[in-house]
Amino acid sequence: MHLLPELASHHAVSIPELLVSRDERQARQHAWLKRHPVPLVSFTVVAPGPIKDSEVTRRIFNHGVTALRALAAKQGWQIQEQAALVSASGPEGMLSIAAPARDLKLATIELEHNHPLGRLWDIDVLTPEGDILSRRDYSLPPRRCLLCEQSAAVCARGKTHQLTDLLNRMEALLNDVDACNVN
C-alpha cells in the first residue's frame, strides 16, 4: 500500500481542482463503505501550498501507512481491505478496519498526537453509516500550526508564515524520523 516517492507528479493544484478532488474522495469513501460495512480510516497528508504530490508527501504518507498498520496489529484489529492512490489533493489511503469506530478514532487521535509526523497526517474515521468522527466530538482543540502555537486554520487563513518555512519544517520532521528509523 506504499507509494513510490520517485513517481510524484509535483503538479501545482488549483483551488477548483482541490475541491473536485475532495468531492471525489467523499464519493470513494461512501462507495467503499457500501462494500465494507466496518469503520473506514481515510488518510491523507497535510501539505501546505499548491503541490500536494511530492517525494516528501509520499514519504510522509508511507510512514503513516506503516503506523496505521502497526496500530491495527497492536490492537488486534483486522484490516479487511486497504488501498492507496494519488489524487489532485495528494496521497490518499483507505483502510477498512474491523474495530469499534469510537475506539479507532481515539487511537488515531493518539497516533496523530504522539508520532513525530502525526501533525502532518489527517486521519479521518468514518462509521459504517458514513458519519465522520471529528476531533470536536472528543472536545479536542483544533490542530496547531507547524511553526507556532496558534490554530493551524488561523495561521493558514491569515497566511501568517511563509510557505517555504512550512515546507522546510515538514522536511525537517521527515528527515528526523528517517534518521531515527521511527515507524
From Swiss-Prot:
GO terms for biological process: prosthetic group biosynthetic process. One of its GO terms (molecular function) is holo-citrate lyase synthase activity. The keyword Nucleotidyltransferase applies. Keywords: Nucleotidyltransferase, Transferase. Its EC number is 2.7.7.61. It catalyses: apo-[citrate lyase ACP] + 2'-(5''-triphospho-alpha-D-ribosyl)-3'-dephospho-CoA = holo-[citrate lyase ACP] + diphosphate. It is an enzyme of class 2 (transferase). Transfers 2-(5''-triphosphoribosyl)-3'-dephosphocoenzyme-A on a serine residue to the apo-acyl carrier protein (gamma chain) of the citrate lyase to yield holo-acyl carrier protein. NCBIfam families: citrate_citX, PRK01392.1. This is Apo-citrate lyase phosphoribosyl-dephospho-CoA transferase.
